[in-house]
Each structure stands twice: as structure tokens, then as C-alpha cells.
Amino acid sequence: NPFILLDVGGATTDIHYSKDLVDDNIVTENEYDRLVFKKLGVYKSRQSLIFAAQNNEFVYELLTHLKVTENIFFEQTEKATKVLMQLAIFLVLCKISNYSKAYISLKLLAVNSIVLTGGITKVLTTEEIEDIIAFFYKKILASEHRPVTILDSNYDIWTIGAKEKQLCL
């Protein structure tokens, strides 16, 4: 703790976070909460994700960092899928940071670990994810802080959650 969990999928990108990252402006009794970004999926929400990316002032700098151009948005390649997943990570982090006032603002400098699960773990490497997170922290938060990146490629988190739910029934 504190942690955030990102589930980047085809239709949505979900973020689960520990409540110790939330400013006092949110009332919650749970130890954690979540947000679902319906328009930041990589397959079913592809066009919405691209639109959101094109409207972020830092995305073209990020694309340059990734050594691609905006033409990647129109490609149907494995490389394009990787870039879209990286953009989904970046855009969600922007939405939950002080950069964007549209959603809650999490204390991202206090995050010790970022766990990634979902389809993203089958497409991106740890290094590719860490590169995006480092870009976000440096560019948006002006910080050298680097949370530990953990890939849940076997969906262990969901298995544990399902088992605990059965015990409660």
C-alpha cells in the first residue's frame, strides 16, 4: 500500500485504488474504490481512445517518445495495439492526477505500486509499461518517483477476489 490497479481491456480501462490515495473530498467507507473509463478501451472503444488521445496536449510528445507518429492511430497492427494500450495507461493516469480536474485527484506521488491486469499483460512488457509510467511521472507530475510495476498476467487478483467472495456467501 498504497496501490493502484489498472485493468486495460478491449471496452474499458478500470482503475482500482486504495482509499489512502484519495483526498478528503471523497466520502467512502471502503478500503478501496474504482473508476471505470468506458471510452478508453483498446478494441471496442478504439475510436474514443484515439479521440481522447488527440485532445491531450502531451500525447504528441508521448508519441515522439515512443518513436511513432499519429499515423499509428490508423494502423491495424500489433505495434498500433501496443501504442494504444500505452496511451490508455497515460490517459487514465492523467485523468486521476492533478492535471485533470474532471475526476478524482489521487495522491500519485504516494503510490508504491501499480498493478496491471487484463489483456494488457498479454501485449505489453514490463519495460514498455514502466516507460509510460516514467514518462507520465516526469512530464505531468515533474517527479522522478517510480512506483513498482507488477503485471498480473495470470489474473491471480481476480481469482483471489472470487475465492474470498465465495467464502463470504
Show the residue positions of the predicted features.
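Helical "lid/coupling" subdomains associated with nucleotide-phosphate turnover
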Residues: 1-6, 13-169
